[in-house]
Amino acid sequence: MSEAEYLTQEDFLQRSNKLQEISDLGINPYPYEFPGTSSVEEIKQEYASQTLGNSEDATNKKTPKVKISGRMVLFRSMGKNAFAQILDNDQKIQVMFNRDFSSVAGLPEDAEISPIKFIEKKLDLGDILGIEGYLFFTHSGELTILVETVTLLCKALISLPDKHAGLSDKEIRYRKRWLDLISSDEVRQTFFKRSRIIKLIRQYMDAQGFMEVETPILQNIYGGAEATPFVTTLNALHSEVFLRISLEIALKKILVGGTSRVYEIGKVFRNEGIDRTHNPEFTMIEAYAANVDYHSVMTYVENLVEYLVCALNDGSTVLTYSHLKQGPQTVDFKAPWIRMTMKDSIKTYGDVDVDLHADHELRNILKERTSLPEESYATAPRGLLITALFDELVCDKLIAPHHITDHPIETTPLCKSLRSGDADFVERFESFCLGKELCNAYSELNDPLHQRMLLEKQMEKKALDPDSEYHPIDEEFLEALCQGMPPAGGFGIGIDRLVMILTDAASIRDVLYFPAMRRLESENN
């Protein structure tokens, strides 16, 4: 439906006529306020277990009086009574309109239409109502409000999706998330959980002594990851700038400045593909702590995730999943998690001991056992061949939480080499579960001369391949390292993917209010 198409729909026209009729009665269908309300959740918490009395007690005003607002999502008329369900945030409550008791705010006493007929004929599903009335329990034990006064707070001009069919079209669900939220209890719960997860992360990080900061989204030089940036122009300075692809570099500069534990939760932008686990705009947490290495960071990460799982799951560390291609799975997030080097994981889960194979043999294995195009690894160095084998043969099998450690040096220039002296591998780990990468972490490189050398090597590769994702050298960052950055460990977690894991979501689009979508033809006109 185009932006204007709904204006000619029969339902819209009928509701618009009702809107005019309501206005003609002297009722403002869009009032300015409705103060003094309680939430449905608060009312249920306070009164659901009390003895309140029946509808007769409510009619005699002997039960507690309450005031709520919300969207009418169900309505049925039964003789002199009418029943409705009011949705407020993620909670619903039944209300009862009575022919002899209920009134309509603003309806003139001499109006030709009675209050109950106004409620039945002029109100529609989707309207937002203010309700004042008295609580009681029905014969079936349902907490209900006997309505004394109903106030129309907003006349909805477009009908709700069918109550039983809901929104089956995923395209519409993602584009018109407001309809999805109104229609689905499950969707609302997912986004309430998302909000709570972010709040819990902050609580955990603050309790661990980390300070939250904010750093620029617009940057003169992008860095901290291998990704293609969004490019824009800062008109005031007549300069090209980039939307950040990572939070890392700015946070390390703050570490140099003397803040020993620092974190940021913020938006990151990568001008790359869209799939089940990737969106060009996403939310990350990155954190850096002085005087720790990647072993300590593994403990931080697994304890953080265990804390979140327990907080959302009544103290249990076990979650059950239904959307995995391997079928239903039960996963325990209790720390400590499995720790395994990348090479060992390829041997264990991919049945390939990379130490026994030359580079050309690794290429043959990739050709025989994966669907990767040959040009993607034909000239790749050994470290990237090992990484490709891991990605193709191992990732999907990491259902239980794993920390995969000791990655090839070709995967990042920002990490310290193994302290064992093997310069081909670095103290990096990635955390996986449900076949998804959850976390990326390093023992951070703080030797400025070694850092410059590694970044210059990347620049040489970029000169040979202009389409590569290697970023330009940030001289300010190198200057900051020369000032002295303490030994540190750092991690980054994609919060959207974390929410997927904690809510059993099948796609990243299910945990983003408004995911990136292709522009509609009507939007191009």
UniProtKB/Swiss-Prot annotation:
Q: Which Gene3D superfamilies match?
A: Bira Bifunctional Protein, Domain 2, Nucleic acid-binding proteins
What does the UniProt cofactor note say?
Answer: Binds 3 Mg(2+) ions per subunit.
Q: Which cofactor does it need?
A: Mg(2+)
UniProt keyword Chloroplast present: no
Q: Which domain of life is it from?
A: Bacteria
Q: What is its EC number?
A: 6.1.1.6
Location in or out of the cell = Cytoplasm
Name the keywords, alphabetized: Aminoacyl-tRNA synthetase, ATP-binding, Cytoplasm, Ligase, Magnesium, Metal-binding, Nucleotide-binding, Protein biosynthesis
Reply yes or no: does the keyword Metal-binding apply.
yes
Q: Where are the transmembrane segments?
A: none
Where along this sequence does the record place binding of Mg(2+) 1? Answer: 430, 437
The first-level EC class reads ligase
Q: How does it assemble?
A: Homodimer.
Concerning its family, UniProt says: Belongs to the class-II aminoacyl-tRNA synthetase family.
Protein's name in the database: Lysine--tRNA ligase
User: What species is given as this protein's source?
Assistant: Chlamydia caviae (strain ATCC VR-813 / DSM 19441 / 03DC25 / GPIC)
